Amino acid sequence: MSRHEGVSCDACLKGNFRGRRYKCLICYDYDLCASCYESGATTTRHTTDHPMQCILTRVDFDLYYGGEAFSVEQPQSFTCPYCGKMGYTETSLQEHVTSEHAETSTEVICPICAALPGGDPNHVTDDFAAHLTLEHRAPRDLDESSGVRHVRRMFHPGRGLGGPRARRSNMHFTSSSTGGLSSSQSSYSPSSREAMDPIAELLSQLSGVRRSAGGQLNSSGPSASQLQQLQMQLQLERQHAQAARQQLETARNASRRTNTSSVTTTITQATATANTANTENSPQALHNSQFLLTRLNDPKMSEAERQSMESERADRSLFVQELLLSTLVREESSSSDEDDRGEMADFGAMGCVDIMPLDVALENLNLKESNKGNEPPPPPL
């Protein structure tokens, strides 16, 4: 409550500082603490000639204005963003801008939106007079019967009292209030920089309204019988809704049963069709299988082809026999040419030139070997 929560000085970078806060009405989102403002802090974009709006914390506001009663037109002191004059109320600021700066189109920040809770601290406008006429024209009276009010708890310049807020983010919304805050709709653009507690302010304002209009609320409030009637009506509506829900569920179940029966019928028909098709195709399949077996049993070669194959087999058998015999025959000396010729003649005499079985050839070969073993060895050279 005694600090500007979520606000930092753009000169000394002190955050959540105490005391007065000065808001520049020309530079976007530029704040100074009291010490930096009094020392004349400047930057490349900010100079000492820029109009500044002084904003107080809740504690300082209660200290300065505690116990005083303000009229509706004098809740605070505002600064003109064009000429820098201070001490204006909302009404007098509007009159001053309309008369002195009606043709000025410089972009400035609204001091009322920056100082009052519920406003945008960085609301930039190039038509300040129209903004004042549309947004801040109606007085904020809480009680129509009273001409004065205590604004000590209603409007205070201290923002940042409810929690931290972002310095460069704006959150826009439109609020309309009757009787409590304004008699006409007021459009604000508060940002998260507006961290004061709006709920506490609203509750305090509503408490004043209840005190002033307590009799009217008691006379026009709903009675116990009316509340009972409302409860009965709500119960009837619930019963009707439950009955309608049950009807819908019954209809859904019936439709599901119908769909299930139709699907079952379709599956049965498809099965019968498939069985019929299988029955019709079975004789044809049997005939085809018999036809294939018949083709396998039928001879595929003619007589000439069979003879040529037999002759080819005989030639192959002869070649194999000669190959085996050549490996079994013992090699003789190269000098005995006559013995070689005799062996070849004997080999021809065995009948190997003709086609013979393999066992017959082996038997003839054994006989030849036994005869050669009985002959005397040749004389040495």
UniProtKB/Swiss-Prot annotation:
Zinc fingers (C2H2-type) by residue: 78-101
Gene3D superfamilies: 3.30.60.90
Keywords: Acetylation, Coiled coil, Cytoplasm, Endosome, Lysosome, Metal-binding, Phosphoprotein, Transferase, Ubl conjugation pathway, Zinc, Zinc-finger
CDD domains in UniProt: ZZ_PCMF_like (cd02338)
Subcellular location: Cytoplasm; Late endosome; Lysosome
Organism superkingdom: Eukaryota
Alphabetized InterPro entries for the sequence: Di19_Zn-bd, KCMF1/Dystrophin, Znf_C2H2_type, Znf_ZZ, Znf_ZZ_sf
Compositionally biased region (Low complexity): 175-192
Stretches of the chain forming a coiled coil according to its record: 224-259
Entry-annotated residues carrying Phosphoserine: S2, S169, S189, S212, S335, S336
Protein name: E3 ubiquitin-protein ligase KCMF1
Gene that this sequence comes from: Kcmf1
